[in-house]
Each structure stands twice: as C-alpha cells, then as structure tokens.
C-alpha cells in the first residue's frame, strides 16, 4: 500500500485524487494532507480519510480544527505545508497546490526522499534547474500529473529519448478560442470560467483561456524531458482527445488518447508504470469521433504563449517573473480589477522591466517572485 501525502486536497486535482483513493482503499492511504480555506470540505475529508497530519493556511483555522480533531496533528501557513510534505510516514507526495507556494514543499520532499507526483507546474517553471538537480542527486523521478506531460511520459515508455524530433503539446484553445482579440475586451469572469472540455479550478481555467497555462506546460516539458524549446510545439486539438504526442527522427508519431478526465493522469502518476481500472460514466469509444481536428497556434491571437516561450528561452529568473505576474493579474481579473485582455499586458510589462539573473539560487528566485508580485499589484 502506498501512503500518500496530498497537498491541495480541496482543489480540483485534490478532489479527483481522493476519488481515486476512495475507489482503491487497498492500494492507497492518505496519511497527511493540506487544504487552504475551504473548511467545510476540509472537515469532511479529515473525517473520511483520517490523516495523521494536516496543514491549513490560517492560524485561526488550525486552532479550530485542533479542538475538533484532537488525534490529528495540525500546522498552518507555508511552514505547515513544508511539515506535511516531509511527513515521515509518507511514501509519495502529490503536490496539487496552486501557484509558486508549491516550490519549497516539493524541494523539501525531494530532500526527504519522497516519490514526487507533480501537479504544481509552477515548481518547475520557477526553479526547474534546482528541482531537477535535487531530484537527480536523490535519484528521484518526478512523475507528471498534467494530462499533457503524462501523455508524453507514456509515449516515451521504452523509447530512446535521444531519437526525439519534437514534443507536441496539444491545447483545447480554452473558453475563448473562437473570439477575436477585439471581442475579448467584453468578456466576463463567468464566461471565462466555462471551459469547453475540462473541469478545472478557476485559476487554471483562466490560464487555459489566455494560454498562459500552455506556456507554463511548455516550460514544464522542457525540464521534465530535457527537450529544447525549439523542439516543443503547441497545436490546437479542439476535442481534447489526443493529450499530446512525440515525433521521432524517423518521422513517426506516438500519441496518447483518452477521455478528458484528470483521473487518468493522476492515477498513472500514483501507479506508474502500472495501470488501474477507472469507472467512467461513459465508455470512451474512438468510433464516437468521426474526425479529430488540429490547428496551428496564432501567436498574435494568443500572445501569452509567445511570452512564455520567450521567458523560457531567456531563462534565469524570467520564468519566475512571468509566473508571479500572471498569478497576480489573474487574481485581479477574478476580483473584477482587471479586464481579461489586460492579463497579458501586465505580464509583458513585468517582463520588460526585469533583467534576468542567470542560474539563480533559491533565495534569489523567492525574492524576484515577491518583488514581481508587489510591482504588479501596484498596476491593478
């Protein structure tokens, strides 16, 4: 039985992870977890899964829960996340928290020798060089939870990675894929949160609509698979059936197909290289799709993706700036402070004023992250 440490238990990925664990109680046990501010859902999870250690964000929530669950050890804040991530009895850390707050817990868990299932893409975006270096030193593999990177991992099984021609990441195009740039000036938060194919959290859904999410995934793929940015291509695949592909030097492609359900990549990360049965509401039949459609990305229509490629190629602290600026800009949009089409402008502004620092250490990354957030907040 694998003992799971789950960060971000009440979020979209966390909820679907718990569904998998619920279906397979003989294979998985939640021994520690974290959640943010959703106390109602958090209480229910603690009652059902009976973790031994829990981290919440606020001190007041920790105090409240300590009185309700005297047999559980509680922590709070970032230090609480770090305590939970390194819980001695845990085998696997599944990091599903949103944002750069997931970086330090991941590094701590690697240092503690935990297996890592990574859904927090910001960890690799902001500090990929540090994370991959630490994982190599500890002989730990980072198993991706993102559907696209899980697809690449599966496509590369048994293959010689030196024979990769390119990685092809697929994208749905998001909520506004058929709107012009001019039409984006009028879109609402409610409209932006209606993703055509996937059920995701709010921030991720907005990132999908701007395609910053795909840009972060490009950087994540660069670090996970050691592929140059020029050899990572993004294509629009409207049906979200082909989750990603690998092209090899002989011209052949290997693709991973499946229903757009995050339980598949989550479970694969937990059972790799094994697979388990997943009960779907509707069986996936390839014959239900008379055609699959592919489109080139229009970088004028999706400037966020171009910004992400630029940040990745510049390297150093520039990806940290892009990520931090985007997090603040998206929060501003969700709070009604920023128009949707201004999200990219805020990120570009932050990048233009920053001179990248090469091969940054952890303290430098954290400092640049905080400085960028503070700057973008002044623009809201």
UniProtKB/Swiss-Prot annotation:
It comes from the Bacteria. 1-deoxy-D-xylulose 5-phosphate binds at residues 121, 147-148, 172, 195, 208, 213-214, 217. One of its GO terms (molecular function) is 1-deoxy-D-xylulose-5-phosphate reductoisomerase activity. Its EC number is 1.1.1.267. Signal peptide: none annotated. InterPro entries: DXP_reductoisomerase, DXP_reductoisomerase_C, DXP_reductoisomerase_N, DXPR_C, DXPR_C_sf, NAD(P)-bd_dom_sf. Transmembrane segments: none annotated. SUPFAM superfamilies: 1-deoxy-D-xylulose-5-phosphate reductoisomerase, C-terminal domain (SSF69055), Glyceraldehyde-3-phosphate dehydrogenase-like, C-terminal domain (SSF55347), NAD(P)-binding Rossmann-fold domains (SSF51735). Its cofactor is Mg(2+); Mn(2+). GO terms for biological process: isopentenyl diphosphate biosynthetic process, methylerythritol 4-phosphate pathway involved in terpenoid biosynthetic process. Mn(2+) binds at residues 146, 148, 217. Belongs to the DXR family. HAMAP family: DXP_reductoisom. Catalyzes the NADPH-dependent rearrangement and reduction of 1-deoxy-D-xylulose-5-phosphate (DXP) to 2-C-methyl-D-erythritol 4-phosphate (MEP). This is 1-deoxy-D-xylulose 5-phosphate reductoisomerase. It comes from Listeria monocytogenes serotype 4a (strain HCC23).
């Amino acid at each position: 039985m694998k003992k799971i440490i789950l960060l971000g238990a009440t979020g979209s990925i966390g909820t679907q992870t718990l569904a998998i664990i619920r279906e397979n109680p003989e294979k998985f046990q939640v021994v520690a977890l974290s959640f943010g501010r959703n106390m109602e859902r958090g209480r229910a999870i603690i009652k059902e899964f009976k973790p031994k250690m829990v981290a919440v964000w606020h001190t007041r929530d920790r105090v409240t829960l300590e009185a309700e669950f005297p047999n559980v050890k509680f922590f709070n804040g970032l230090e609480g996340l770090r305590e939970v991530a390194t819980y001695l009895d845990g085998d696997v850390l599944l990091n599903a928290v949103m944002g750069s707050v997931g970086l330090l817990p991941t590094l701590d868990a690697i240092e503690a020798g935990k297996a890592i299932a990574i859904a927090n893409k910001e960890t690799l975006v902001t500090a990929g060089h540090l994370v991959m270096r630490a994982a190599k030193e500890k002989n730990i593999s980072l198993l991706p939870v993102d559907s696209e990177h899980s697809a690449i991992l599966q496509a590369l099984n048994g293959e010689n990675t030196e024979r990769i021609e390119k990685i092809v990441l697929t994208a749905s195009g998001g909520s506004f894929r058929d709107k012009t740039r001019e039409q984006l000036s009028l879109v609402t938060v409610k409209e932006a949160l209606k993703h055509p194919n996937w059920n995701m959290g709010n921030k991720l859904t907005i990132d999908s609509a701007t395609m910053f999410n795909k840009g972060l995934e490009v950087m994540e793929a660069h670090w996970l698979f050691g592929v140059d940015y020029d050899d990572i291509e993004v294509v629009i695949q409207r049906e979200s059936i082909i989750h990603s592909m690998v092209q090899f030097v002989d011209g052949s492609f290997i693709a991973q197909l499946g229903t757009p359900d995050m339980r598949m990549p989550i479970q694969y990360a937990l059972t790799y290289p094994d697979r388990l049965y997943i009960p779907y509401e509707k069986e996936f039949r390839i014959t239900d799709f008379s055609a699959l459609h592919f489109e080139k990305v229009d970088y004028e229509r999706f400037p966020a993706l171009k910004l992400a490629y630029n940040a990745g190629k510049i390297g150093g602290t520039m990806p940290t700036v892009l990520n931090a600026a985007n997090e603040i800009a998206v929060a501003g949009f969700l709070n009604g402070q920023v128009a949707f089409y201004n999200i990219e402008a805020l990120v570009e502004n932050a990048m233009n004023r920053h001179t990248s620092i090469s091969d940054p250490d952890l303290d430098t990354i954290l400092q640049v992250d905080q400085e960028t957030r503070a700057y973008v907040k002044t623009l809201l």
